[in-house]
C-alpha cells in the first residue's frame, strides 16, 4: 500500500524537484499539497505549486494556499536564490486549475480526518502551516504518522552563521513542530550540503530526454549559478528539499541519529538555530531523527531513475 503524504512547500527550485520526485514514485500517495511563504511571496509559491502540477498533469491533487507571514515575524524571502518568480529558468506552463477555496490548514485537517491511516507530512519550507495545524487541531495529532522537514543544521547556517533559512523564517513555528511529541525527521544542511548535484548530473538528467527531465535540468541550470559563489566551497548545488522525499523512498542511502532538537527563538546571534543535543548533554529524550550523511551517488541515481517515469 502506498504511503499517504501531504506536502507543504514553498517552490523554489528544490521544492519543485521534490514534487517531481514524489509524483514519480508509486510508493507514495500525495493526498494534498499546500503552499507556504518562504522562497518567494505566498502568492508566487502557490502559483508555482499550480504551475508544477499543471506541468506534471496532476490537477486531481487538492491544493491550498497557506499563511501569508510567519507566526510572529515579518516575512523574509529568498529571491536572491530562486529569482523573481521563485522558479526562474525554464518556461513553465500557466496554471490550468485553481486552488481550493479554503486554507492550507483546513485542507491538511480535512485530509487527515478522512484518511484511513496516519499520514506523513513532508514540509520543505518554513513550518508555519504545520505549526498552525498542530495548534488548532490537537485532536488530529494521532492521525499524523511523522513530520519530515527540510530545515535546520547541527553546525553551520546558510542564512545566518547559525541558522538555516527555513527555520530562520519562522523559528517559533519550528519549535512548535519539534516539541509537538509527533515523530520528526530532520533533513538539515548537514545532509543536504552533501546531496550536491554536479554539472555532469544535470547533463545526465537532460539526456534522459523527456519533457520533465528537461525542465528539471533547466531548473538546476539556474539553481547552480547561485551556488558557484566561492564562499560555499561547493562542487555543485545542494538539492535540499528532495532529501525529504528520497528518505521516504530509500532510507538506506541516509545515515541518521536520534537526538533532541530545540529551536532558538531569542538569541542575539543564534535566532533560528536548531540546537541538536548530539552528546546527550541536556538529559532530554530524543524528539527527532536527524539525517547526518547521504550516499550522494545513490541519491543522484534515484533522481535519474524516477525522471524516466515521465517518458
From Swiss-Prot:
Active site positions: 240
GO cellular component: a single term: cytosol
Keywords: Glycosidase, Hydrolase
Family: Belongs to the IUNH family. RihA subfamily.
Pfam families, sorted: IU_nuc_hydro (PF01156)
Entry annotated with the keyword Hydrolase: yes
GO biological process: nucleobase-containing small molecule interconversion; purine nucleoside catabolic process; pyrimidine nucleobase metabolic process
MF terms in GO: purine nucleosidase activity; uridine nucleosidase activity
UniProt name for this protein: Pyrimidine-specific ribonucleoside hydrolase RihA
Organism: Salmonella paratyphi B (strain ATCC BAA-1250 / SPB7)
Protein purpose: Hydrolyzes cytidine or uridine to ribose and cytosine or uracil, respectively.
PROSITE patterns according to UniProt: IUNH
Amino acid at each position: 500500500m502506498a504511503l499517504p503524504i501531504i506536502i507543504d512547500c514553498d517552490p523554489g527550485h528544490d521544492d519543485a524537484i521534490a514534487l517531481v520526485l514524489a509524483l514519480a514514485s508509486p510508493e507514495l500517495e500525495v493526498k494534498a499539497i499546500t503552499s507556504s511563504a518562504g522562497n518567494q511571496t505566498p502568492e508566487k509559491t502557490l502559483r508555482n505549486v499550480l504551475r508544477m502540477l499543471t506541468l506534471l498533469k496532476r490537477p486531481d491533487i487538492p491544493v491550498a494556499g497557506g499563511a501569508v507571514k510567519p507566526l510572529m515575524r515579518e516575512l523574509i524571502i529568498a529571491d536572491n536564490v530562486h529569482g523573481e518568480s521563485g522558479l526562474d529558468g525554464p518556461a513553465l506552463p500557466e496554471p490550468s486549475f485553481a486552488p481550493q477555496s479554503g486554507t492550507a490548514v483546513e485542507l491538511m485537517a480535512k485530509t487527515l480526518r478522512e484518511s484511513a491511516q496516519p499520514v506523513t507530512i513532508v514540509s520543505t519550507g518554513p513550518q508555519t502551516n504545520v505549526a498552525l495545524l498542530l495548534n488548532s487541531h490537537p485532536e488530529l495529532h494521532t492521525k499524523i504518522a511523522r513530520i519530515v522537514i527540510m530545515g535546520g543544521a547541527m553546525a553551520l547556517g546558510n542564512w545566518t552563521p547559525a541558522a538555516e533559512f527555513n527555520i530562520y523564517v519562522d523559528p517559533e513555528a519550528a519549535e512548535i513542530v519539534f516539541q509537538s511529541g509527533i515523530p520528526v525527521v530532520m533533513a538539515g544542511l548537514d545532509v543536504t550540503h552533501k546531496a550536491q548535484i554536479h554539472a555532469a548530473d544535470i547533463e545526465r538528467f537532460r539526456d534522459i530526454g523527456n519533457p520533465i527531465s528537461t525542465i528539471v535540468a533547466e531548473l538546476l541550470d539556474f539553481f547552480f549559478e547561485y551556488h558557484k559563489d566561492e564562499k560555499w566551497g561547493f562542487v555543485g548545488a545542494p538539492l535540499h528539499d528532495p532529501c525529504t522525499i528520497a528518505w521516504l523512498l530509500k532510507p538506506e542511502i541516509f545515515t541518521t541519529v536520534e537526538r533532541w532538537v530545540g529551536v532558538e527563538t531569542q538569541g542575539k546571534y543564534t535566532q533560528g538555530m536548531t540546537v541538536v543535543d548530539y552528546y546527550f548533554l541536556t538529559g532530554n529524550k530524543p524528539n527527532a531523527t536527524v539525517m547526518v550523511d547521504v550516499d550522494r551517488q545513490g541519491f543522484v541515481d534515484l533522481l535519474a531513475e524516477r525522471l524516466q517515469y515521465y517518458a
